[in-house]
Amino acid sequence: MSRISKAEMSKLLSVYFIMGSNNCTKDPLQVLREALEGGITIFQFREKGEGALTGEERICFAKELQAICKEYGVPFIVNDDVELALELDADGVHVGQDDEGITSVREKMGDKIVGVSTHTIEEARWAIENGADYLGVGPIFPTSTKKDTKAVQGTKGLAHFREQGITIPIVGIGGISIENTASVIEAGADGVSVISAISLAESAYESTKKLVEEVSRSL
């Protein structure tokens, strides 16, 4: 197996859904199914924060979500937990700046997908040099889902990455909705990652379809 190509990674980032059990008011398995039917291109399991599952329950829940992703042929990424990603034989892992270092993550993950959250050009260059397949850049807009976020960058912050010669695939993160998706793509992102825009939508299916349309219209 070899590392994923830039072109393939770029396509996968189009509509990137992130979810844990505590991000939904409905059955999360049903929400994921609807999102997959609607056209998400990649999924990240992020079980964090108040009311999050732990231990065996967390592992069982991850396996259920992974099985659904497999049915649809959509990559299943684990947030921040390299050991869990390896245990599940997940398609990849996404790490932040305060998590395990990228060099050790790449070593453990082999050729699987590795994404890194970055907030500065320096962080981006370090991640690229040490084996990141894509960058998560943000928060682009204010968000209430993550309590530990850095300062809002706006689409200008994202455009700055491209202006500074960062050519690796980028997914915009933070406060992204159907209404502002186009501006994120126009600023240079390959895709958008969302939590509540899908997980709390009245219809996860309809919301996903609209996000897919917005992204393909803006690319």
UniProtKB/Swiss-Prot annotation:
InterPro entries: Aldolase_TIM, ThiamineP_synth_sf, ThiamineP_synth_TenI, TMP_synthase. CDD domains: TMP_TenI. Its EC number is 2.5.1.3. Pathway: Cofactor biosynthesis; thiamine diphosphate biosynthesis; thiamine phosphate from 4-amino-2-methyl-5-diphosphomethylpyrimidine and 4-methyl-5-(2-phosphoethyl)-thiazole: step 1/1. It is an enzyme of class 2 (transferase). Binds 1 Mg(2+) ion per subunit. Mg(2+) binds at D80, D99. Its cofactor is Mg(2+). NCBIfam families: thiE (TIGR00693). Belongs to the thiamine-phosphate synthase family. This is Thiamine-phosphate synthase. The gene is thiE.
